[in-house]
Amino acid sequence: MQRSTLLLPFLFGLFMVTTKVDAQYAWDFGIHLGGANYLGEMGGKDQPRRDFVWDMKMQQTRLSVGGFARRRINRLLSVNAGLMYLRVQGADELTDYGPRSGRNLNFRNDMFELYLRSEFTIFQDNDLGGRGRYKTDFRLFGYAGIAALYHNPKGQLNREGEFYDLRPLRTELVDYSNLTLAIPAGIGFHFTKKRRHRFGWDIGWRTTFTDYIDDVSTTYKDPSQMSALGAQLSNQNNYVAGIEGLPHPNNYGYGVNQVSGQPENVRGDPTHNDSYLTMTFTYSYVLRGQSNYYRQRYNWIRGTKRVGRKSRAKF
């Protein structure tokens, strides 16, 4: 899929934010708080890589927190922009799949995500419970958009001691960027109490444009072209070599195919980019628009009677 196509939700959101609408509008400002997990080469369960949540280790879920601003465009569409901090991590030591256990790599990544997404209403009830009091409303929505992501993977030697920045160590002799794009998509809901306090929940999947969230992607490279520390972090099979049930150490580390002359030992899976999942609770405070249209149409809900313009009688 071309990047120009993936930018369409972002451009559409900007267009809608700047479009004047003849209806009630509302801003709300709030926070996210929840967890994040990732899908990539690292860790996993007892099989080779599988898509989506089936290959995630729930015990590796870590903090996700952020803030956002949302504008309601109309009853079916809102635009949400926010900044989130989240941590994802993984370790081959935690998997029951032999080839990954033998690789024995690990990482953690503290990431910052700046996103813009469009939220599409699936279902809405403006008078939850149907009592005519209009004190609580409910909205179920789906969303999609675009995000800019800053990430910085770090790793340990055998999951002990200091964490080292992996990108400058070039463990696969690749100069990848700290910045990338992601495509967020998900579903959520919120309750609005007394038109001011909005409590919600959402879950979202992010597909990224990089395979280096975990610093693992292709094959083992020549350690002589790395620093001593980079070479140690690139291949950590030596810490588990000889453990019964794991593949032979010859399956790990730099080796050249005698026919093609290319590295032959697989370190990662370059056919799939890394992804991550967030699940957060949200709270926001609603600011209502005060246009003449809004006052005339909705004052009856607040108990304010509409009063027509009076004129003096003429005799």
Predicted regions and their residues:
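Residues on the lipid-exposed face of transmembrane beta-strands in outer-membrane beta-barrel proteins
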Residues: I31-G35, G67-R71, L116-F120, A144-A148, ...
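Structural signature of outer-membrane beta-barrel domains
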Residues: A36-G40, G82, L86-G90, F123, ...
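Repeated loop/turn-to-beta-strand initiation elements of outer-membrane beta-barrel proteins
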Residues: L39, L76-V79, D125-N126, R195-F199, ...
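Residues that define the transmembrane beta-barrel architecture of outer-membrane proteins
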Residues: Y25, Q59-L63, D110-L114, F138, ...
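Gram-negative (and chloroplast) outer-membrane scaffold detector with strong preference
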Residues: R75-L77, L83-R159
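Extracellular loop and loop/strand-boundary signature of outer-membrane beta-barrel proteins
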Residues: R50-D55, P99-F107, G129-G130, P168-D175, ...
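Surface-exposed strand-loop-strand hairpins of Gram-negative outer-membrane beta-barrel proteins
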Residues: A36-S64, F68
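Predominantly the C-terminal beta-signal and adjacent terminal strand-loop region
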Residues: K194-F315
